């Protein structure tokens, strides 16, 4: 994949611990560094990310990815909800993974969980397949396709404990992508920037149709750039009707 630039990520051990109640082990830090280097190389051919400066990459791709699963990393994480019930997670899917975020950092952090990286762009999936192989990540797999099609596929529908959606579409569209893929009791995590009560109210009718409820909304500030972020935790409490997800393109064109 070409020569790798030798830019080093910051260690940030104290910030990991203070904000997530967790910090990576030495091998995980090495994997994060290797991931960063391979993403920089891949960026020469593919538009994977505009975030390439080491501290910004650490915050917006590594820390942000893992902030969403903070309850899985530590039951005593600062700022996470005691009400959020997260049993053992064996299968997760990252919908619209792009350059592999949040899926790959989560696979590195949760070695017991198999993470499927879903994207419709074949070139990005081909890159991620090579990256996973080069990094020796055993608990990550790739899948090329649209969420609307994968959600109707018997091999994937109602098959995952955890669904991750970051920077893909409006919340109701993300919910329509994610909830059909979850087992009963499964959890969808929607990574958002700003979030308002009006958006919560607008999301509710879609969740009623999809068999989901809002279990928790976590607001937080990023540790370096001090930006406002939110994670929405949606619980699947009833089977998703067979009509969802609707055909390719329709969820975005006509949101629930």
How should each PLM-predicted stretch be described?
Residues 99-112:
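Conserved SAM-binding loop of SAM-dependent methyltransferases across substrates and taxa
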Residues 113-116, 120-256:
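S-adenosylmethionine
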Residues 7, 21, 84, 99-102, ...:
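Compositionally biased, intrinsically disordered/low-complexity regions enriched for serine, proline
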Residues 2-89, 93, 123, 129-140, ...:
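Class I SAM-dependent transferase core
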Residues 94-98:
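Conserved S-adenosyl-L-methionine
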């Amino acid at each position: 994949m070409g020569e790798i630039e030798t830019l080093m990520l910051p260690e940030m051990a104290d910030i990991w611990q203070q904000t997530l109640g967790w910090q990576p082990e030495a091998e995980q830090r090495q994997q994060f560094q290797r991931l960063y280097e391979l993403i920089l190389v891949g960026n020469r051919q593919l538009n994977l990310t505009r975030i390439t400066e080491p501290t910004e990459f650490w915050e917006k791709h590594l820390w942000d990815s893992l902030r969403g699963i903070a309850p899985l990393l530590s039951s005593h994480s600062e700022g996470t909800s005691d009400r959020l019930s997260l049993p053992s997670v064996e299968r997760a899917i990252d919908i619209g993974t792009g350059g592999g975020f949040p899926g790959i950092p989560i696979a590195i952090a949760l070695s017991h969980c198999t993470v499927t990286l879903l994207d419709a762009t074949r070139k990005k999936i081909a890159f991620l397949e090579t990256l996973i192989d080069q990094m020796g990540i055993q608990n990550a797999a790739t899948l090329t396709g649209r969420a609307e099609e994968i959600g109707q596929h018997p091999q994937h529908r109602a098959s995952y404990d955890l669904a991750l959606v970051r920077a893909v579409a409006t919340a109701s569209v993300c919910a329509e992508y994610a909830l059909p893929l979850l087992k009963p009791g499964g959890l969808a995590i929607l990574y958002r920037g700003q979030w308002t009560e009006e958006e919560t109210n607008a999301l509710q009718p879609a969740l009623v149709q999809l068999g989901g409820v809002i279990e928790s909304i976590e607001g937080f500030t990023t540790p370096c750039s001090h930006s406002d972020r939110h994670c929405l935790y949606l619980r699947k409490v009833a089977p998703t009707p067979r009509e969802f997800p609707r055909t390719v393109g329709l969820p975005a064109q006509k949101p629930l």
